[in-house]
């Protein structure tokens, strides 16, 4: 069945690339951020897809570098009164939903996500209304308003387990917004899943022909793939998983060379995990084609040192995340279900 909104035809204006900083400027902003974090009783929570220098700063200041599920856990449990979320807007909203008593700052509130943009709440509500017999499961990469409509929120790290659980209960599913991840989960579980047709602009660009050529060039390499990638790319993988699961796979696979099909921001932590292995970027452009994202989310790239310093220094409407209380309470229900379910998996 077609949906009311077609993300494939939507045009997402990319933000301008941040102005490069000199070595001296980087050193200046790094020290300024460290000082401001202490003064504000703040901690950094950074996603794997942010730039390496941002992840390094989060490490050095006692913050967190992780996938969206662990970011949510860390921020809710940390005693800091202020969370600086280096990521995209839905991550800041999720932090505010889980920690309403804390000040949530972002380097920019214009850091979007194509999956979030590709699932407008009005169209999604109409889609759900047309299928009232289905349990609504939405990916973490959605707005607070879409989460508020859901029965469950899920991340890629526990998606298969959750849908397998719901399928065992005989529940039919609406899955949104990522069509590739939805199809992967459906294939793994056999569940009755009706997918919204969104896609990540980064993972959607991986090309099978170019990947095949790279594989022929490096026949001893293992291929690691995020399930937001097209099915044909997933079918070529030696390991499929979330960001944290791909890092774990890099450690356990015997191969000394790894081709990685996800945002290249992950290379910072993956290379730390396997310093003796060679990491190669999976190609994003096919024969005669060009890439838009080129394996790095343009909105993640907005989380620069200068923007982080400005967020900590200025606060205010340009940097602080707010979620209306009634909306927050509704979105909290499926988020807590996710966290509780994830806790049962961890034992």
Curated annotation (Swiss-Prot):
The lineage of its organism: Bacteria, Pseudomonadati, Pseudomonadota, Gammaproteobacteria, Enterobacterales. Its main location: cytoplasm. It catalyses: iminosuccinate + dihydroxyacetone phosphate = quinolinate + phosphate + 2 H2O + H(+). Catalyzes the condensation of iminoaspartate with dihydroxyacetone phosphate to form quinolinate. It is found in: Cytoplasm. One of its GO terms (molecular function) is metal ion binding. GO terms for biological process: 'de novo' NAD biosynthetic process from L-aspartate. The gene is nadA. It comes from Escherichia coli O9:H4 (strain HS). One of its GO terms (cellular component) is cytosol. This is Quinolinate synthase. Iminosuccinate binds at residues 47, 68, 139-141, 156, 226-228, 243. It is an enzyme of class 2 (transferase). Binds 1 [4Fe-4S] cluster per subunit. Keywords: 4Fe-4S, Cytoplasm, Iron, Iron-sulfur, Metal-binding, Pyridine nucleotide biosynthesis, Transferase. Its cofactor is [4Fe-4S] cluster. Its EC number is 2.5.1.72. Belongs to the quinolinate synthase family. Type 1 subfamily. It comes from the Bacteria. It holds the Pfam family NadA. Pathway: Cofactor biosynthesis; NAD(+) biosynthesis; quinolinate from iminoaspartate: step 1/1. [4Fe-4S] cluster binds at residues 113, 200, 297.
């Amino acid at each position: 069945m077609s949906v009311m909104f077609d993300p494939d035809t939507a045009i997402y204006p990319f933000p301008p690339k941040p102005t490069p900083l000199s070595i001296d400027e980087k050193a200046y902003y790094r020290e300024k951020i460290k000082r401001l974090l202490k003064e504000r009783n703040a901690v950094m929570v950074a996603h794997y897809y942010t730039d390496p220098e941002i992840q390094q700063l989060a490490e050095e200041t006692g913050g967190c570098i992780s996938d969206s599920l662990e970011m949510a856990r860390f921020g809710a449990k940390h005693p800091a009164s202020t969370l600086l979320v280096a990521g995209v807007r839905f991550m800041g909203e999720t932090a505010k939903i889980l920690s309403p008593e804390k000040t949530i700052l972002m380097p920019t509130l214009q850091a979007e996500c194509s999956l979030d943009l590709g699932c407008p709440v009005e169209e999604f509500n109409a889609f759900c209304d047309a299928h009232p017999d289905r349990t609504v499961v939405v990916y973490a990469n959605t707005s607070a308003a879409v989460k508020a409509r859901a029965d469950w929120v899920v991340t890629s790290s526990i998606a298969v387990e959750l849908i397998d659980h719901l399928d065992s209960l005989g529940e039919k599913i609406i899955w949104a917004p990522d069509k590739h991840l939805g199809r992967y989960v459906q294939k793994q579980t056999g569940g009755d899943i009706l997918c919204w047709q969104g896609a990540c602009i980064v993972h959607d660009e991986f090309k099978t022909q170019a990947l095949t050529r790279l594989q022929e060039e490096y026949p001893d390499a293992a291929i690691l793939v995020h399930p937001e990638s097209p099915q044909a790319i997933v079918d070529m993988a030696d390991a499929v998983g979330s960001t944290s699961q791909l890092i774990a796979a890099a450690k356990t696979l015997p191969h000394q060379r790894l081709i990685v099909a996800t945002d290249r921001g992950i290379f910072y932590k993956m290379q730390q995990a396997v310093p003796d292995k060679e990491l190669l970027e999976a190609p994003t452009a096919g024969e005669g084609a060009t890439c838009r994202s080129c394996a790095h989310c343009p909105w993640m790239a907005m989380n620069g040192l200068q923007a982080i310093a400005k967020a900590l220094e200025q606060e205010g409407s340009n940097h602080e995340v707010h979620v209306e209380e009634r909306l927050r309470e509704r979105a909290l229900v499926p988020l807590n279900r996710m966290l509780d379910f994830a806790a049962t998996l961890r034992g």
